[in-house]
Amino acid sequence: MSDGFDPTRLTQARRLAEMTKKDVAHALGVTPAAVGQYETGVSRPRPDLIPRLAEVLGVPATFFLAGRPANRLDSSMAHFRSLRSTPKSQRERALAFAEQVWELTYALERRIQLPLVNLPGFAGGEVHPGAELPTDPAEAARELRRRWGMGEGPVTHLVRRMESHGIVVVMPPASDPSAATVDAFSTRAARPLVVLTANRADDVYRHRFTAAHELGHLVLHGDATGDSRQEKEADAFAAEFLTPQDSILPHLPKRMDLARLAELRQIWGVSIHSLVYRCRELGLISDATTSRAYQRLRALDGQPGFIPESVSSYSGEQPSLLRQAFELACKEADLSVATLAHELAWTPQRVRELLDVREQRPVLRLVQ
């Protein structure tokens, strides 16, 4: 098997396992330099090491074979929600996860036509090729709402809406370490991808704002390396996209009223914290009032009217595009988890994790 060994697959598997070259070397009984040479293609691992590599990294031995479609990503091609607090190893793991999502999407698109990419300014978009949005975040948000025919009111089913416009949205399973260690991120490679993470899934309003934030990165920042300025711009985009100034302003209290903001939270689908900030941003309250409001919110946390709501109660805010594409391919193209696992050289469990589908096994019922 070493004759068809793909060095980039070793790098991908190692990053997915969040292991260093030294870790892999120790498990194999070789030097870190040897692992480095395997990954650069200077040398190849002995055939007898391949099964051990597969065991250590948790992939089938066929995972390392060359010839499968791939899309290599690096950190310059993605925007991380918490860039400064995301260690390099975790960013690399998240990017390797995104690479796998691309491979899965590619495999499904060979069989099923996904929604066309309707994202102005996105280089790969079929609907608005070459079109650009304004560079000002708020103006860009208003223009995208107009192009998507969203009107002036609250945004319902945000994640489903993004998927309907050709954006692949995924949320790693809670069992995936990256779900807890890496905040949301987005990338424009091939087809726009937004990765939402389980660490915000207990609060649907934070989850929706994060999705809108990543949408802002996709339309505003291209492949530019993220920084604090771009994070603020993505926040400004999300605020205007979810709560357009002209629409929300007449409903905001002129004096701080958390009970009223709790009502507006239900209508507009954004957190009370976001609404407090919006009041300050629009000049309705002072910095001092804003600080007192945040202190009061901390005291009210968990009380009736101020309890976070889980994403699990809102189907329109849960990714479903890839799962639905798989289900359609099963029906129309005789696809199965086993077929995808063989084609991608993944374990069946990994395929199910990324598709968010349960293992289907017959239930044995004993007759008494």
What feature does the model see in each segment?
Residues 1-368:
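Short juxta-domain linker segments that transition from a proline/glycine-rich
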